[in-house]
Structures are given as structure tokens and as C-alpha cells.
């Protein structure tokens, strides 16, 4: 794949996303500000998937014919490219159907007595944060229920960041799970500090990186986390593909989550021995074309340069926070400054329900998310039923931020001002 870009040539980038040219039902061109929920795909990703399907589609790791060989090569080459994009080794990556499955895989293994992640004596503690997406909370609730452990969590400060003073860890803690970027407040976690605290008590760390991998340079080896998860559809890639990263020495001793074909060494009627990692964790027919598409997305972002992506998105977020903060009656849920802040910008408007904000913006062709964003405990922390959320990607413009602010003003005039 070739992509010719000057430093963040927005015209060239936007030309790669045909959907951005769409005129919506209100007669306005689409301003897509919902990439935190799912991102749009560039033609390079669509073309990579299509090229694979029309030329090399075959069963991976099975048989000896040419299509099988080409499919297997494409699948494993994709693993190499994706691993390089996040600062990991290829044999440390497991493909799943989404980040939720990746996090469930890890939590399931922690409850398996073949893995020495927990003691199983009922005295273990599992730690997460009040900021979490349900995908990084409910699996740990279930693990605590299954093994009789206690679930504890870091609280949240009034500006939507992890409150490091709210919890002290001890040797009973076995796992600390947290998000790199909050999908609601946009707060960036102090990853190295949390990893250091976990290591002091012998706990393992699990990072939900869904909101960070598409938006900034991420080096998982450099961060020092033990596990990490992210989804393809949030980083310009296909639906139906997620990634689990695990340190090699952990992955090599972890028992499987799902069992069946493709993940075995030998099978008898009495017992089974399993393939080495990562194949041990990829039971059944894999999502080959989606891996090809996700690898194309990683190459696309890498060609632009993740530092340039991060700088561009910081400009957009700063403009959104500043513009919304100037509106009387609008409250940002999250940090007001750009220090330790990611892409999502969530807000509420006095006297106007979030769904009404979303409807007015939709009439203007501006797509945002409204609701609790799969983070009910966090919304309860702020005594809110719902927020509106704008979230940005490399293809967004300052003009689209201006349209967001104008739409909120229009909604406030219509619903909230006498």
C-alpha cells in the first residue's frame, strides 16, 4: 500500500474516506464525530480486504494448496505488522473478535486453576477503576464471583481522572485492570505509575487500549503492562477483529479460553494437548480477511505517523473543549486542560437531555454519541443519566468542531432558554 502525504494533508486523508462526502437527511454534509464508538474505514483498508478475498481466500493453517499458503502468509504477516504498530512481538498477539472478548479471555484464565494468577483461597483482590467501560468491569465482577475474590476500585476525581489516592494496594491484589484513555472523560491514565504500584505487590496489569491505540503512539513493551486489548473497528479497521496482547512468558503458560479445531497438537478420546501460543488461543476458523484489513489500517496510520495523528487530534480536542466551555450552560465531563487528555469529549447541557442534543446535531449532519457509553458507574459518579460525546479521529477538521459547537448552541436556544 502506498500513501503520499505531506505532514497531515487533511485533504488527501479525507479523500480516502468516501463516507465523509455523504450528504445526510437534513441536507448537510456528514461531520462524523463518533469515532470513539466506531471509526470509518479508508479505501486502503477496504481494498486490502477485497484484494485478499478475490485473490487469496483460503483456510488458514490447513492443507497444502496455494490458496491456503497465501491465506496463512497474509494472516501471519498481518500479525507481524499489527504487533510492530503497538510495540510488541508477533508471538505475543492473539486475534479475537473484539476487545471485549480479549478482556474476557484474560479474566477467564485468571480463574483457571492451571494458571497461577490467583490463589483461589477466597482472599484475593481484583482491582479496577470507576472509569471503566463495562467490558473492563463486568468480566472482573464475574471473576470475583467465580473464585470468591473481592473487587475493589480506584475512584475518580471531579475532573474525571483516576484518583490514585483513593486506594492502596497490598499483596492480596492479583490483577489491576484499567483503561489507557477513558471512553467518557478522555482522561489518560498514569500507566507507568499504575504498573509500578502493581509490580510492588506482585500483581499483573491489564490495559484497555481501545481509545489510545488509534490516537497516539503506543509502545506496550515500553509501558510495561502484562496484558492489553483493543479493537480493529475503532482504529480504521474492520468489525469483528480484536487483539489481545500478553507478555510472551505469560501467554506461553496460559490455558486456552475456547477449545476446538486449529488450537491442538494431538487429540485422543481421553485427552488433548494444545498448540503453542498464540495459536492455542485461536480456536476455529479465524477472521482472516479482517486481520488483513486491520494490518492495512495499522500501515495506513503508520504512514501518516502517529505523532502527527496525536498532534492533529489534540488540536481538535482543544478546540472542542474551548468552544463548548464558552457556552453558558454547558459542562465538560472530564479534564478541561489538554494535559493527560485523549480524544473523547463528553458534556451535558443544562435543561437539555443528551438525546435531544444528539437529535439536533443529527439534523445538522453532526454525528455524536449520546447515553452512558457503556460506563454506567462513571455516570453515577457524576450523578448523570447520560452525556453527549464527541470523539475525533485523524480525518476530522476544525470546521467540524465549529459545527458541533454551533449545533449545541442551537439546541440550547431551542430547548433550554426561555
UniProtKB/Swiss-Prot annotation:
> Its Gene Ontology molecular function terms?
cysteine desulfurase activity; pyridoxal phosphate binding
Cofactor(s) recorded for this entry are: pyridoxal 5'-phosphate
GO BP = cysteine metabolic process
Identify which residues the record assigns to the active site.
Answer: 374 (cysteine persulfide intermediate)
Source species, domain of life:
Bacteria
* Alphabetic keyword roster: Pyridoxal phosphate, Transferase
Q: Which reaction does it catalyse?
A: (sulfur carrier)-H + L-cysteine = (sulfur carrier)-SH + L-alanine
Q: What is its EC number?
A: 2.8.1.7
Q: Does the keyword Transferase apply?
A: yes
Cross-referenced InterPro entries, in alphabetical order?
Aminotrans_V_dom, Aminotrans_V_PyrdxlP_BS, Cys_dSase_SufS, PyrdxlP-dep_Trfase, PyrdxlP-dep_Trfase_major, PyrdxlP-dep_Trfase_small
CDD domains reported for this sequence: SufS_like
Q: Which residues carry this modification: N6-(pyridoxal phosphate)lysine?
A: 234
Transferase is among the record's keywords:
yes
The record's Pfam families line, in alphabetical order, gives: Aminotran_5
Q: Which family does it belong to?
A: Belongs to the class-V pyridoxal-phosphate-dependent aminotransferase family. Csd subfamily.
* Protein task: Catalyzes the removal of elemental sulfur and selenium atoms from L-cysteine, L-cystine, L-selenocysteine, and L-selenocystine to produce L-alanine.
Which PANTHER family did the record assign? CYSTEINE DESULFURASE (PTHR43586), CYSTEINE DESULFURASE 1, CHLOROPLASTIC (PTHR43586:SF8)
Name under which the protein is recorded: Probable cysteine desulfurase 2
Q: Which organism is it from?
A: Mycobacterium leprae (strain TN)
Q: Which lineage ranks, top first, belong to the organism behind this chain?
A: Bacteria, Bacillati, Actinomycetota, Actinomycetes, Mycobacteriales
Amino acid at each position: 500500500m502506498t500513501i503520499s502525504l505531506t505532514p497531515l494533508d487533511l485533504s488527501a486523508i479525507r479523500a480516502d474516506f468516501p463516507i465523509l462526502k455523504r450528504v445526510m437527511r437534513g441536507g448537510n454534509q456528514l461531520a462524523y464525530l463518533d469515532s470513539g464508538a466506531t471509526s470509518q474505514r479508508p479505501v486502503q483498508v477496504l481494498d486490502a480486504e477485497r484484494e485478499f478475498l478475490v485473490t487469496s481466500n483460503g483456510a488458514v493453517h490447513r492443507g497444502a494448496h496455494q490458496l491456503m499458503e497465501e491465506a496463512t502468509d497474509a494472516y501471519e504477516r498481518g500479525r507481524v505488522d499489527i504487533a510492530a504498530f503497538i510495540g510488541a512481538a508477533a508471538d505475543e498477539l492473539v486475534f479475537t473478535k473484539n476487545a471485549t472478548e480479549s478482556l474476557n479471555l484474560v479474566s477467564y484464565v485468571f480463574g483457571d486453576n492451571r494458571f497461577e494468577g490467583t490463589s483461589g483461597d477466597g482472599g484475593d483482590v481484583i482491582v479496577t477503576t470507576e472509569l471503566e467501560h463495562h467490558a473492563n468491569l463486568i468480566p472482573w465482577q464475574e471473576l470475583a464471583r467465580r473464585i470468591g475474590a473481592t473487587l475493589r476500585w480506584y475512584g475518580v476525581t471531579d475532573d474525571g481522572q483516576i484518583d490514585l489516592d483513593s486506594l492502596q494496594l497490598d499483596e492480596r491484589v492479583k490483577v489491576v485492570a484499567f483503561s489507557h484513555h477513558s471512553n467518557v472523560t478522555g482522561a489518560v491514565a498514569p500507566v507507568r505509575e499504575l504498573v509500578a504500584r502493581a509490580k510492588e505487590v506482585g500483581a499483573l496489569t491489564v490495559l484497555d487500549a481501545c481509545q489510545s491505540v488509534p490516537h497516539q503512539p503506543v509502545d506496550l513493551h515500553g509501558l510495561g503492562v502484562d496484558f492489553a486489548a483493543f479493537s480493529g473497528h475503532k482504529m480504521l479497521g474492520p468489525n469483528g477483529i480484536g487483539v489481545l496482547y500478553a507478555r510472551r512468558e505469560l501467554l506461553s503458560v496460559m490455558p486456552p479460553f475456547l477449545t476446538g479445531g486449529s488450537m491442538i497438537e494431538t487429540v485422543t478420546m481421553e485427552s488433548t494437548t494444545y498448540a503453542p501460543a498464540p495459536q492455542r488461543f485461536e480456536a476455529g476458523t479465524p477472521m482472516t480477511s479482517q486481520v488483513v484489513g486491520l494490518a492495512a489500517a495499522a500501515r495506513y496510520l503508520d504512514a501518516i505517523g502517529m505523532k502527527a495523528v496525536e498532534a492533529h487530534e489534540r488540536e481538535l480536542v482543544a478546540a472542542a473543549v474551548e468552544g463548548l466551555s464558552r457556552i453558558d450552560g454547558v459542562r465538560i465531563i472530564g479534564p478541561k486542560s489538554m494535559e493527560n487528555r485523549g480524544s473523547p469529549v463528553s458534556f451535558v447541557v443544562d435543561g437539555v437531555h443528551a438525546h435531544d442534543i444528539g437529535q439536533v446535531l443529527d439534523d445538522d449532519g453532526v454525528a455524536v454519541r449520546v447515553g452512558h457509553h457503556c460506563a454506567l458507574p462513571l455516570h453515577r459518579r457524576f450523578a448523570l443519566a447520560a452525556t453527549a460525546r464527541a470523539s475525533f479521529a485523524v480525518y476530522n477538521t476544525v470546521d467540524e468542531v465549529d459545527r458541533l459547537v454551533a449545533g449545541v448552541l442551537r439546541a440550547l436556544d431551542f430547548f433550554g432558554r426561555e
